[in-house]
UniProtKB/Swiss-Prot annotation:
Name of the molecule in the record: 1,3-beta-glucan synthase component FKS1
Organism classification: Eukaryota, Fungi, Dikarya, Ascomycota, Saccharomycotina
Subunit: Component of the 1,3-beta-glucan synthase (GS) complex, composed of two alternate catalytic subunits FKS1 or GSC2, and a regulatory subunit RHO1. Interacts with RHO1, which is a GTP-binding protein.
Entry function: Alternate catalytic subunit of the 1,3-beta-glucan synthase (GS) complex. Synthesizes 1,3-beta-glucan, a major structural component of the yeast cell wall. Involved in cell wall synthesis, maintenance and remodeling.
A Gene Ontology biological process term: ascospore wall assembly
Coiled coil: none
GO cellular component: 1,3-beta-D-glucan synthase complex; actin cortical patch; cell periphery; cellular bud; cellular bud neck; cellular bud tip; fungal-type cell wall; mitochondrion
């Protein structure tokens, strides 16, 4: 050992003379900490320099004897074990310490243990800790003698703890790390060593740690070292290498070296090293590396890991960039090993590493996203493709070419410096000139072409083949229906063979897009030219011969040559499609994915190191996708494409006989069937994508069910006996009984575990005392005299009688669910647990921002807001009646005991029963009678444990601590015997073990800025759970004026001393480079706290989850899933391992777990959200994890901490882009070779949103986040490199779900367009008498009719498809419920959903998903939306619901509904009823799911609010107004101006950057134009007088009608606005002096006129159409679409940016432009505002009419008696007896409400009457008018009015060309000629 230590001691110049040690013996322990705080002037904090005044932690200047230069060795130079005073051995590094050290408690020498052991009267067996009731002096807490026993207890440990400390201190001095960071990382490292060495020898523990962090095959550092070819840099230097291609000479040498490598004997290291001298291949480099690593001494290994941890611990944002950190570490290591460092005498100043190395990179990262304006950070208006993000920065270090780009200020390249000098010059690097984009996240749909190219090939090519085969009329010469003549065979083959050309074209486009996304200057960019030319050749091969076939001869000539060529080309096309479907784009025709070359090894290592599937998993993956596509292709062909065959044949060959349009005659109307056919095919094409997803869901569900039976999870598994065998299973699966001596009876051990579970449920008030008695094991006298025996509860046996529900639990209770799942889960295969002593240490990490910690009394017993009808406590009592009953009984017992203790029992006896009932009222009402804090606190806790609070999460996950103590005690009975009756000593021992193995870390970034009540709650948490660790951000003012404040990451727990200012003194306080919150918040919050995690694994938990004792007992098995517990004692650096063998090593990175959504059964929406989460998190995760498609979804996944933290952390953090931050960590793990598993037997609780709005906020966040994911490089790597089966799994499990929603909405819109055109076609045509069973060559009657019936029947097919696609979404929920809870529960839940209209909600949610995705990909602006945590009992005002959902769903629903109305009236079909239901959902869902929407009074008060919402905000700013909503909607497109004037209205504005014009044209204008064109064509056709005998003079001018009705309202509005603007400018300021409402009056006039004008032109259209309702409808629809198009163009192309304040709007109406803070823009703004107001007036009219229509449609419901009660039952699933009472108002309030209701009720019915009049009036008039209105007009306006009473039947004898023989005999055909 000494030889190893020698060089190290040479480096440290720490004298260990006796004088230095003796001088401190009295007052200080061996590490220089004051032993008796009374003797020390203050606790030494390295952050406070001597002489500076005490900082906010209230420190005195450090003691004189302390303030010595640490290089003299007086700080830690004492010999070990010197501090004998306390018999304790503490280090200032450890988390424990004597009083006065940061790891100690503030309560002096004793503190109350956070959890007491089970079994004692005060024991805590529950998630609710016990407060009070015991004397804190009773338990004297002797702190553990050794904080890291597994390492220090073993005499074999290769390095002593003192030597490790010396290493950390030495590194800190030499490289300038912070003192607190060093202490933190030392503790971190020791906990890691302790955790490992508890299950292996210390030597192996250190070796395996070094292998994981630095040198092993799975270590990221080693992978990077070889990927970036740093072995070459170390050998010959990058500056001496020509980076890039190998020369011919080098290639020859490479072959020779490879041969030498194969011949070498790996056992003889020396000989092999000599042989491979000069060989730069990966195998040789790997051999050299292993040999080098194998020779390291333990001290050097410690030094390597310590240096990495110290770098990582202070890297703050750089932790997200794993390889950048590796580079910094490499530079530091080179410097450390060099003589330059050894010879340096004075230490580096503290903080040098942070300030010199990390902060410049931090500033670069921050400046990419933010700029400083007036001293505050403002987000730059850059989209992702202009921001050099974390990934771009990181990828610079992947390739030597990138590292070569690093330049210093003086222009020198870093690689030109010697290795040892690089670290010292890192501060001089000009990072701004170094980093660049390595992947452009351009906001475009083209990413989908590249990333998912194989999906398009599989669908578009096959659809082409199916379609071409079934459309013979397109390539048949002179097709005649009566003959049904067939095309040439060659043409049939050739047109199908074009599918191969389509596939090649897709690949070419994908490659071109890739060219634009991956900048060529990045060394990792693939060389695409070769692939591009190859693709062009394949394209030519596929297309050339087909051109030959079609051009070779006329379509009347049969040619054998053409036939043969066409047939061969068909098979070539099939081969092309199969090849392109299977081959990833990344591997096409290039060496990019080949392992043989070192050129792209970095991209393979970091973006394509997928863990392969093996054995059954691989075959299962293949089977899933073969089944899906076999089913899909056959079903699509027979159901979708064959049904098109007849419509294609008819529509493609029919020409219409119509008069046409005044301006262009019959050009358009003749081809109407072909236009309809195009629309039908387009709609069917979208459906072709949809049904793949449908089959994926079905097959996935089937496989998942199969697996659940196989695992024995299902309740339907016949052999289950889950309760009878439960005790045996607890013994075999929960307890680690293998190493245990047999002398203890299993029953004794099982009983302790079982009783603890039952008692914990009793303490959580889930079980009443009588239930508990039946469920516990009891001690009863034995038959043997004097002995006692255990009696098992009858529960285990009587389960089979099926009467257990009533006897043992409350029916359908939480206790029943938990015990059932526990029993069920133990019947599945579970990894064997290790003894507690040997289990690894792990941490639970929870980020917290502003979520509720603990509910306040006010929140519980006061109504939420004016719209709520119930207090939270009332609602919770209704949801959990049994638990409330138990709680009240418990409280009463407590109150009686307290009363008895105070001596009042005599009075109690005298009270009669009635009085006691009255006395109990307060208990049952609010849970307490006395307002003493201990009673109110109990009620607060009871409510908090049933809401989504942080307290619930912490109390739930602190059960790990209880579980560990319980298991340790049960499995080690000798410990209990050893302590005898000393309960305190036993508890201390158990505490020690729990603290060693489990940590709970909450990242409360805002703690330092908490309000008093939040601080009080946080302090309450720390007192209840002293072992809870809280990391927070601490801020200090800057040292010099004008600089940024200093920000620290600090850590406290419940043992930290409380200072005078009420705050706690932190254990660790590490300075950061600046504010760490640069992204969307959550990932940065996790990252800053990550340095405080301990152990080998982290469980990531959100602040609204829960856990249970019985689940925590399984923790050892869950951790065993990482496959690292039974490590064989192998040397990872053994020289025999070949490079090829090690590439197969893929560690488990993430273990996912199930979630139980505890908000289910609290109403329909909560239950839908819960069902969705269950199927996604359980049913699908089960199959996905097996076939390698599961990613990481945040909670409640366990992660392999070393694997993830060395690869960029637990989430990604670029603002906007990484919106769903968790999933990126999963993709990152998958790309870098980690495996992701799913654990079936363990589940946590999770809260979900319960309100309509909050659920859809979450939906919006997920949808927008998916839009951002589509742009991300992870999708690019996965999509272009995964093997086909894994790619399909990934696609359909993640983006496919969202694109499927998008396709559903797209197909719905396409269908509406098709329906409008098809209905107008059917409306105007005389249909044939159609019989599908007759041959198609029969003569159609009447002669000259149009046989459109098959096309009309297609609507039925389409409806059925959409219907199935929709209902299939419910299959997984039902199946999941079926297998987990049985048939009855599944049926019950399904019918509850149906009766509660949950399908309506599903349709709406699907629209929100697709709308969020669409708008994100077009406009951007995705932001983090915090999801709701409360209960949805408030009635939300109509105006808020309307403004929230109008843009995303209601407008689209209303437009489609008008089109559907036209379709229904023009040509009625029963299947259209389904669309009426769907579209009603889009319009009415927000109001149907609004609590108390139909309460009479509330409805009309809400109407009042709506009217006021429409009219306010024009005189002065109002937070909630129509104009505000319109401006915000518009700003998403136009963006905001930067100029601020400090007005209140600016606060609400937020950030919105201007959308890219190209995107707006693609996403807003073009679809709008297509829609307008589609409606316009249908409108002109329905007016084209089909079949009417006319002359050219009779052509109608329907186009002019559209022009008039579209533009006239806009022109009138413009006139009104000019008038108002003139009025306001001239007289507004004058009026303003006396009238306060000038603006409102002006706006009111303009808005009123706009509404009247739009309604008037609706009637005008009716008149122009000669009062024909059908034609008027399509006319109005067309006008609306045309106006939309005009307004979109105006907004996108004419409007400048919006002001953040509201001044321009108010100035327009009041005329006060001056003094509004607009500066010179006051001159240009009026014209901009005028343009905006033109659009606004039409929008106002639309919102006024649409809002009223929605309100009027609710009238039939409002007038139903007791509707509110039925509606509440539907929403909340509360029985009528448990209904929420109506609110109670004072008399004055009641009178006021009644008056308002009368007033607005009258207004409502008045508007209703006017609307009715507008419809009834023209309808009545139409019956009175018989002659053509426009007869008297001539010229252009001659046929402005549609002629009436014309006959359009020109069939049979009415035909103009009728001859008796025509169409009654078969015409003769041309004869064929044949060429040989």
């Amino acid at each position: 050992m000494n030889t190893d230590q020698q060089p190290y001691q040479g480096q440290t110049d720490y004298t260990q003379g006796p004088g230095n040690g003796q001088s401190q013996e009295q007052d200080y322990d061996q590490y220089g900490q004051p032993l008796y705080p009374s003797q020390a002037d203050g606790y030494y904090d390295p952050n406070v320099a001597a002489g500076t005044e005490a900082d906010m932690y209230g420190q005195q200047p450090p003691n004189e004897s302390y303030d010595q230069d640490y290089t003299n060795g007086e700080y830690y130079g004492q010999p070990p074990n010197m501090a004998a005073q306390d018999g304790e051995n503490f280090s200032d590094f450890s988390s424990y310490g004597p009083p006065g050290t940061p790891g100690y408690d503030s309560y002096g020498g004793q503190y109350t243990a956070s959890q007491m052991s089970y079994g004692e009267p005060n024991s805590s067996g529950t998630s609710t800790p016990i407060y009070g009731n015991y004397d804190p002096n009773a338990i004297a807490m002797a702190l553990p003698n050794e904080p890291y026993p597994a390492w220090t207890a073993d005499s074999q440990s290769p390095v002593s703890i003192e030597q490790i400390e010396d290493i950390f201190i030495d590194l800190t001095n030499r490289l300038g790390f912070q003192r607190d960071s060093m202490r933190n990382m030392f503790d971190h490292f020791m906990v890691l060593l302790d955790s490992r060495s508890s299950r292996m020898s210390p030597d192996q523990a250190l070796l395996s740690l070094h292998a994981d962090y630095i040198g092993g095959d799975t270590a990221n550092y080693k992978k990077w070292y070889f990927a970036a070819q740093l072995d070459m840099d170390d050998e010959i230097g990058f500056r001496n290498m020509s980076l890039g291609k190998l020369s011919r000479k080098a290639r020859k040498a490479k072959k020779k070296n490879k041969k030498a490598m194969e011949e070498a004997n790996p056992e003889d290291t020396e000989e092999t090293l000599n042989k491979i001298e000069g060989d730069n291949s990966l195998e040789a480099a790997d051999f050299r590396w292993k040999a080098k690593m194998n020779q390291l001494s333990p001290l050097e290994r410690v030094r390597h890991i310590a240096l990495y941890l110290l770098c990582w611990g202070e890297a703050n944002q750089v932790r997200f960039t794993a390889e950048c950190l590796c580079f910094i570490y490499k530079c530091a290591l080179d410097y450390l090993d060099s003589p330059l460092c050894q010879q340096r005498q004075e230490p580096m100043p503290e903080g040098d590493f942070l300030n010199r190395v990390i902060t410049p990179i931090y500033h670069f990262i921050r400046n990419q996203v933010y700029e400083i304006v007036d001293g505050r950070f403002v987000k730059r208006e850059r989209d992702h493709n202009k921001i050099v993000g974390y990934d771009d920065l990181n990828q610079l270090f992947w390739y030597p070419e990138g590292i070569a780009k690093i330049v210093l200020e003086d222009g020198t390249k870093l690689i030109e410096l010697p290795l040892e000098e690089r670290y010292l010059r890192l501060g001089d690097v000009v990072w701004d000139d170094v980093f660049f984009k390595t992947y452009k996240e351009t906001r475009t749909w083209l990413h989908l072409v590249t990333n998912f190219n194989r999906i398009w090939v599989m669908h578009i090519s096959i659809f082409w083949m199916y379609f071409a085969y079934n459309s013979p009329t397109f390539y048949t010469h002179n097709y005649q229906q009566l003959v049904d003549n067939q095309p040439l065979a060659a043409y049939k083959w050739a047109s199908c063979a074009l599918g191969g050309t389509v596939a090649s074209l897709i690949q070419i486009v994908a490659t071109l897009c890739e060219w634009s996304f991956v900048p060529r200057k990045w060394a990792g960019a693939q060389h695409l030219s070769r692939r591009f030319w190859f693709l062009c050749i394949i394209f030519g091969i596929n297309l050339g011969p087909i051109i030959f076939v079609f051009a070779y001869d006329k379509d009347t000539v049969y040619s054998t040559a053409a036939h043969v060529v066409a047939a061969v080309m068909f098979f070539v096309a099939v081969a092309t499609i199969i090849f392109f479907s299977i081959m990833p784009l990344g591997g096409l025709f290039t060496s990019y994915m080949k392992k043989s070359t070192r050129r792209y090894v970095a991209s393979q290592t970091f973006t394509a190191a997928f863990a392969p599937l093996h054995g059954l998993d691989r075959w299962m993956s293949y089977l899933v996708w073969v089944t899906v596509f076999a089913a899909k292709y056959s079903e699509s062909y027979y159901f979708l494409v064959l049904s098109l065959r007849d419509p294609i044949r008819i529509l493609s060959t029919t020409a219409m006989r119509c008069t046409g349009e005044y301006w262009w005659g019959a050009v358009l109307c003749k081809v109407q069937p072909k236009i309809v056919l195009g629309l039908v095919i387009a709609t069917d094409f979208i459906l072709f994508f949809l049904d793949t997803y449908l089959w994926y869901i079905i097959v996935n569900t089937i496989f998942s069910v199969g697996k659940s039976f196989y695992l024995g999870i299902s309740i339907l598994t016949p052999w289950r006996n889950i309760f009878t065998r439960l005790p045996k299973r607890i013994y075999s699966k929960i307890l680690a009984t293998t190493d245990m001596e047999i002398k203890y009876k299993p029953k004794v051990l099982i009983s302790q575990v079982w009783n603890a579970i039952i008692i914990s449920m009793y303490r959580e008030h889930l079980l009443a005392i009588d239930h508990v008695q039946k469920l516990l094991y009891h001690q009863v006298p034995s038959e043997i005299e004097g002995k006692r025996t255990l009696r098992a509860p009858t529960f285990f046996v009587s389960q089979d009688d099926n009467n257990f529900e009533t006897e043992f639990f409350p029916r359908d209770s939480e206790a029943e669910r938990r015990i059932s799942f526990f029993a069920q889960s133990l019947s599945t295969p579970i990894p064997e647990p290790l003894p507690v002593d040997n289990m690894p240490t792990f941490t639970v990490l929870t980020p917290h921002y502003a979520e509720r910690i603990l509910l306040s009394l006010r929140e519980i017993i006061r109504e939420d807001d004016q719209f709520s009808r119930v207090t939270l406590l009332e609602y919770l009592k209704q949801l959990h009646p049994v638990e409330w009953e138990c709680f009240v009984k418990d409280t009463k017992i407590l109150a009686e005991e307290t009363a008895a203790y105070e001596g009042n029992e005599n009075e109690a006896e005298k009270e009669d029963a009635l009085k006691s009932q009255i006395d109990d009222l307060p208990f049952y009402c609010i849970g307490f009678k006395s307002a003493a804090p201990e009673y109110t606190l109990r009620t607060r806790i009871w409510a908090s444990l049933r809401s989504q609070t942080l307290y619930r999460t912490i109390s739930g996950f602190m059960n790990y601590s209880r579980a560990i103590k319980l298991l340790y005690r049960v499995e080690n009975p000798e410990i209990v015997q050893m302590f005898g009756g000393n309960a305190e000593g036993l508890e201390r021992e158990l505490e020690k073990m729990a603290r060693r193995k489990f940590k709970f870390l909450v990242s409360m970034q805002r703690l330092a800025k908490f309000k008093p009540h939040e601080l009080e709650n946080a302090e309450f948490l720390l007192r209840a759970y002293p072992d809870l660790q809280i990391a927070y951000l601490d801020e200090e003012p800057p040292l010099t004026e004008g600089e940024e404040p200093r920000i620290y990451s600090a850590l406290i727990d419940g043992h930290c001393e409380i200072l005078d200012n009420g705050r706690r003194r932190p254990k660790f306080r590490v300075q950061l480079s600046g504010n760490p919150i640069l992204g969307d918040g959550k990932s940065d919050n996790q990252n800053h706290a990550l340095i405080f995690y301990r152990g080998e694994y982290i469980q990531l938990i959100d602040a609204n989850q829960d856990n249970y004792l019985e689940e925590c007992l399984k923790i050892r098995s869950v951790l065993a899933e990482f496959e690292e517990l039974n490590v064989e004692q192998v040397n990872p650096y053994a020289p025999g391992l070949r490079y090829e063998e090690q590439t197969t090593n893929h560690p488990v990175a993430i273990v996912g777990a199930r979630e139980y959504i505890f908000s289910e059964n609290s109403g329909v929406l909560g239950d839908v959200a819960a069902g969705k989460e269950q199927t996604f998190g359980t049913l699908f995760a089960r199959t996905l994890s097996q076939i390698g498609g599961k990613l990481h979804y945040g909670h409640p996944d366990f992660i392999n901490a070393t694997f993830m933290t060395t690869r960029g952390g637990v989430s990604k953090a670029q603002k906007g882009l990484h919106l769903n931050e968790d999933i990126y960590a999963g993709m990152n793990a998958m790309l870098r070779g980690g495996r992701i598993k799913h654990c079936e037997y363990y589940q946590c609780g999770k809260g979900r949103d319960l309100g309509f709005g909050t659920i859809l906020n979450f939906t919006t966040k997920i949808g927008a986040g998916m839009g951002e994911q589509m742009l991300s490089r992870e999708y690019y790597y996965l999509g272009t490199q995964l093997p086909v089966d894994r790619f399909l799994t990934f696609y359909y499990a993640h983006p496919g779900f969202h694109l499927n929603n998008l396709f559903i909405q797209l197909s719905l819109q396409m269908f509406m367009l098709t329906l409008v055109n098809l209905s107008s076609l059917a409306h105007e045509s005389i249909m044939c008498i159609y019989d599908r069973n007759k041959p198609k060559t029969d003569v159609l009657v009447p002669i000259g009719c149009y046989n459109f019936q098959p096309a009309v029947d297609w609507v039925r097919r389409y409806t059925l498809s959409i219907f199935i696609v929709f209902w299939i979404a419910f299959v997984p929920i039902v199946v999941q419920e079926l297998i987990e809870r049985g048939l009855w529960k599944a049926t019950q839940r399904f019918f509850c959903h149906l009766l509660s209209l949950s399908p309506m909600f599903e349709v709406f949610a699907g629209q929100i998903y697709s709308s969020a995705l669409l708008s994100d990909l077009a406009i951007g602006g995705a932001r983090y939306i915090s999801t709701g945590r409360g209960f949805a009992t408030s009635r939300i005002p109509f105006s808020i619901l309307y403004s929230r959902f109008a843009g995303s769903a209601i407008y689209m629903g209303a437009r489609s509904m008008l089109m559907l109305l036209f379709g229904t009236v023009a040509h009625w079909q029963a299947p259209l009823l389904w669309f009426w239901a769907s579209l009603s959902s889009l319009i009415f869902a927000p109001f149907v799911f609004n609590p108390h929407q139909f309460a009479w009074e509330d409805f009309f008060l809400d109407y009042r609010d709506y009217i006021r919402w429409l009219s306010r905000g024009n005189n002065q700013y109002h937070r909630n107004s129509w104009i505000g909503y319109v401006r915000m909607s518009r700003a998403r497109i136009t963006g905001f101006k930067r100029k601020l004037v400090g007005d209140e209205s600016e606060k609400a504005a937020g950030d919105a950057s201007r959308a890219h014009r190209t995107n707006l044209i693609m996403a807003e204008i073009i679809p709008c134009a297509i829609y307008a064109a589609g409606c316009f064509i249908a409108f002109t056709f329905i007016n084209a007088q089909t079949g009417v005998k006319t002359t050219d003079d009779d052509r109608v001018n329907s186009v002019l009608r559209i022009i008039i009705c579209t533009l006239a309202p806009i022109a009138v509005n413009l006139g009104v606005l000019f008038f108002c603007m003139g009025m306001s400018c001239c007289s507004g300021p004058l009026f303003g002096m006396c009238c306060k409402k000038t603006g409102s009056v002006m706006a009111g006039i303009a808005h009123g006129v706009a509404v009247i004008v739009h309604i008037a032109f609706f009637i005008v259209m009716w008149v122009l159409e000669s009062f024909n309702f059908v034609r008027m409808l399509i006319g109005v629809v067309t006008c609306i679409q045309c106006q939309r198009l005009i307004f979109h163009c105006m907004t996108a192309l004419m409007l400048t940016r919006e002001f953040k304040n509201d001044h321009a709007n108010t100035a327009f109406w009041t005329g006060k432009w001056y003094g509004k803070g607009m500066g010179y823009m006051a001159w240009t703004q009026p014209s901009r505002e005028l343009t905006a107001k033109v659009i606004e007036l039409s929008e106002f009219a639309a919102d006024f009419v649409l809002g009223h229509v929605i309100l009027i449609c609710q009238l039939p419901l409002i007038i139903i008696p007791k509707i509110d009660k039925f509606h509440s039952i539907m929403l909340f699933w509360l029985k009528p007896s448990r209904q929420i009472r109506p609110p109670i108002y004072s008399l004055k309030q009641t009178r006021l409400r009644k008056r308002m209701v009368k007033k607005y009720c009258s207004l409502y019915f008045l508007v209703l009457a006017i609307f009715a009049g507008c419809i009834i009036g023209p309808a009545v008039a139409s019956a009175k008018i018989h002659k053509h209105i426009g007869d008297s007009l001539d010229g252009v306006v001659h046929n402005l009015f549609q002629p009436i009473n014309t006959t359009n039947n020109d069939t049979g004898s009415q035909m103009s060309t009728y001859q008796s023989h025509y169409y009654t005999h078969t015409p003769s055909l041309k004869t064929w000629s044949t060429i040989k």
